Amino acid sequence: QSSLRPGIFSALLILAFQAVMMVLSLLRKGGPFASLRRQGYWWLYVTLFSVTLLFLLLIVFLMRRRRPCLDTFFLPLQTFYTAFLCLWGTCVTLLDQFGGNSLSVFTYVTLSAAALTVLQPWQSALIFTGNCLFLNLLLPYTPAGPDNFYSNAVNSCFVTLGAFFISLWFYRSKVSSCYAKSIIEQQNADIRSMNVQLDQMAHTDELTGMK
């Protein structure tokens, strides 16, 4: 369960950040519904807050169950949440295009998702590549999209490639750590078995086989 702590801490940070953004939206002149763009941001904040809260509640529920239940359901749950988080970052980035030409949200959300989760290589390739394609398919329909399509495509592809290699590095590191742990556990089991055999031999007469 200690391996879940970084994910839980990150989810709590996301909850706090979204709560702050919702409060700031409410305090702005005109509120969160003054324009369609503000409404879009508002509902994205609410959606991420709700999904993250549900994610945390499910983790707590799984932690209270038996260990096999946690092992079975946590990784698929984490994969789904990572895909959702990347999609959320892309939607915010598309809204940003109506007030500028920044890919900052797409960049830090994608790289953070790669660094804070453990995905199999095919999962990271599918999530990050699909997210990048989704972004670049919709960018031309934003005000500054046609004029900046090439630069946005290049930058988003570099971010996606970086996210894939970051995710791959963390995955290989996790696999190596688990393999080393399993080897140590097997060696400890062998040592305990040998100690039991030696203890039995020490209390057994070698000629008669009697203790």
Feature names for model-found ranges:
Residues 2-10:
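N-terminal membrane topogenic signal
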Residues 15-113, 131:
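Hydrophobic transmembrane alpha-helices and their membrane-interface boundaries in multi-pass
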Residues 115-117, 206:
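Short conserved micro-motifs on helix faces and helix-strand junctions that flank
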Residues 117-126, 131-179:
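N-terminal membrane insertion elements
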Residues 166, 173-187, 191-194, 198-201:
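Amphipathic coiled-coil signal-transmission "stalk" helices
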Residues 199-211:
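Conserved nucleotide-binding and Mg2+-coordinating catalytic segments in signaling enzymes
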